[in-house]
Amino acid sequence: MAGIDLQSLGISLPPGYSLQTAAARPDMYETLFDPEHPMSSLWPQFITSTPVSEKYWSQLTDIPLFASYQLMILHRDVENKHESVVACGNSVPVYCPLNDLPDGGWEAILQTGIENYRAGHKQHPNLLSALGVTVASAHRQQGLADIVIQTLRALANQAHFEALVVPLRPTKKSEHPMVPLEEYVHWKLDEHARPDDQVSYDPWLRKHLSYGGQMVRIAPRSMTIAAHADQWKDWTGCDLAALAESGSDTSSKGLVEMPIPRALVPVQYDPVSKVASYVEPNVWVVHPIH
């Protein structure tokens, strides 16, 4: 694959903002790992702590080619000229048949992209998979998420990939943890909308559909993690043992199902081992390019 060229994409940004990659500005990308960075807490800690994430995430910048696909939007303060990262978009080139996107969603596509590269790209990447788009709260009225989506689509086109694919984590699903994702993704912003109306209830899904993305299937096991109740308390502040004793539903296997903050579905807690498992579904969205 040839190197990418951001300048040729023709992406317009608001005054004071610039588009960069981790390859071009590793110094700025490193600031995202500071626990005090305003964007460091925007993803739930249990999501960033999955075994797959911990093993593979750093390799997105360790591999020079992939570092070019880690986008940043920088903002320069007018008064003190200080530059900071206010949005980012992570992605990985990957080989995967477009009609066979994995049930393992986010974790599977990240792992496949890295391992295929390490194997010498025996199968040339045919897709660009988005892995996440994050925008600092103070800059969310500037259309930066739109810019990142447009840039990812343009990069996929520049590299002659078949599509940009997204194991999408619906923004508002955590407010409805007991609703199956298969049902949630078909909710409409207007409850009286026609069945074919694409105005989705979920804002992040709605945005992708507005750019031509198409929902193709659910990824039922997009992120998976199992940890002791003490670890879950550190991550979420929830005392799962106490919640389990308070009368939450118990399955035939003796597991207690309970919602936790920022999770899309309930965790499954085992009162005997005090281990809770979380298996998060996402929805595959495809942005066709060619």
Swiss-Prot record:
Pathway: Secondary metabolite metabolism
Keywords: Acyltransferase, Transferase
Domain of life: Eukaryota
Binding residue positions for acetyl-CoA: 157-163
GO function terms (MF aspect): acyltransferase activity
EC id: 2.3.1.-
Keyword Acyltransferase part of the UniProt annotation: yes
Enzyme class: transferase
Biological role: Arginine N-acetyltransferase; part of the cluster that mediates the biosynthesis of a highly modified cyclo-arginine-tryptophan dipeptide (cRW). Within the pathway, avaD catalyzes the N-acetylation of the guanidine group. The first step of the pathway is perfornmed by the arginine-containing cyclodipeptide synthase (RCPDS) avaA that acts as the scaffold-generating enzyme and is responsible for formation of the cyclo-Arg-Trp (cRW) diketopiperazine.
Homology family: Belongs to the acetyltransferase family. GCN5 subfamily.
Protein name: Arginine N-acetyltransferase avaD
Organism of this sequence: Aspergillus versicolor
Top-level taxonomy: Eukaryota, Fungi, Dikarya, Ascomycota, Pezizomycotina
Gene this chain is encoded by: avaD
